[in-house]
Amino acid sequence: MPTIQQLIRNKRQPIENRTKSPALKGCPQRRGVCTRVYTTTPKKPNSALRKIARVRLTSGFEITAYIPGIGHNLQEHSVVLVRGGRVKDLPGVRYHIIRGTLDAVGVKDRQQGRSKYGVKKSK
């Protein structure tokens, strides 16, 4: 606990909040090009093959982004839109690819939660 004299000499420094998605540079989304599309396994206790992509963003960063939904058409050189948001059981994956924009098509036969997977309303 500082004394009053110490506080007069130098005031308390505010804690600076670090951003959880620095590659977006304050933007809501960023465009990028896939450099590698592959699968990886999650941390314990989960088990799956999660689809992820290495993406080179327009901000110059090379990031790892998660591809949500069942099935995708992404491959190397696909242009994608990336948003923030981590995947809890994949260490180092702090971004999501937005489905239904640019080269990432929406999830096929999706009926519920369509807006999150870029699917138009079926008639």
From Swiss-Prot:
GO terms for molecular function: rRNA binding; structural constituent of ribosome. The keyword Ribosomal protein applies. It holds the Pfam family Ribosom_S12_S23. The keyword Transport does not apply. With S4 and S5 plays an important role in translational accuracy. Located at the interface of the 30S and 50S subunits. PANTHER family: 30S RIBOSOMAL PROTEIN S12 FAMILY MEMBER. This is Small ribosomal subunit protein uS12c. It comes from Marchantia polymorpha. The gene is rps12.
